Amino acid sequence: MTNYREIAWQGLWKNNPGLVQLLGLCPLLAVTATITNALGLGVATMLVLIGSNILVSLVRDYVPKEIRIPVFVMIIAALVTTVQLLINAYAYGLYLSLGIFLPLIVTNCIIIGRAEAFASRNNAFSAAFDGLMMGLGFTLVLAVLGATRELLGQGTLFDGADQLLGPWAKSLTIHVWQVDTPFLLAMLPPGAFIVMGLLIALKNVIDKKLKEHQPQVATEPSVTRARITKVS
C-alpha cells in the first residue's frame, strides 16, 4: 500500500529536490532574481513532473528496459514543448524572462530521476502524487530563494506579477523599502549561491533540532556469550 504521507514528506522536506538532492541548480540560480520568475519556472517544472510521471507510469509495462530512458526523454520533451507554447501564448512577458531555461526543463535531472526511480515502478495515481510533491517542494525552494533575492536586491516583492497573472496583478507589487541603487550581489548568480547555501544550512539546523527532540529508543546491552568446555 502506498504511503502518501511519506511521499509528501520526502518531496517537501526530507528529500527535497533543491535543498537535499541539489538538482536543477542551473535554472534555480539563474532565474530566481524575482519571486515572479521563480514561481513561473516552478509551476512549469511541476506541471511537467506530474504529466511525465503519469505517462511514464502508464507505458512502463510496454517499453523495453533497454530503451526506456530515450522514451522517457521523448515524453518529457513533448510535455515541455506543450508547457512552453502555453506560456508563450498566455504569459509572453514571463516567457521572455525565463528564456532558454524554459526548454532546458527537458534536461532537468529531477524529472528524469523521478520517472526512472518512482513513476516506472508505481501506479499512475501514486506517480502523479509524487510528481506533485516533488514539484511543489522544488517550487517552494524557488519561491523562497526568489523572494529573498528580490527583497534584498530591489526592496520589493511580486514585482512583475502581471507577467505571470495578467494586467490585474500589477497591484500585487509590494514595496517593502526604498532602494535607490539595486544590490547587485543579491540579483546576480553569486548572490543566489550564497542565499542557497544559507537555506541549506538552515534546513540542516532544523533537521538536527528535530532529531534531538525525537524520543530515543532504548537498546538492550549486548551480552557476550562464552563457550564453556568441560575439562576432564
UniProtKB/Swiss-Prot annotation:
A GO biological process held by the record: electron transport chain
Segments crossing the lipid bilayer: 18-38, 39-59, 69-89, 93-113, 127-147, 182-202
Cell membrane found in the keyword field: yes
Membrane topology, from the record: Multi-pass membrane protein
Gene Ontology CC, one term: plasma membrane
Entry annotated with the keyword Methyltransferase: no
Alphabetically ordered keywords of this record: Cell inner membrane, Cell membrane, Electron transport, Membrane, Translocase, Transmembrane, Transmembrane helix, Transport
Subunit structure, interactors included: The complex is composed of six subunits: RnfA, RnfB, RnfC, RnfD, RnfE and RnfG.
Family that this chain belongs to: Belongs to the NqrDE/RnfAE family.
The protein's role, per its UniProt record: Part of a membrane-bound complex that couples electron transfer with translocation of ions across the membrane.
Protein name: Ion-translocating oxidoreductase complex subunit E
Encoding gene per record: rnfE
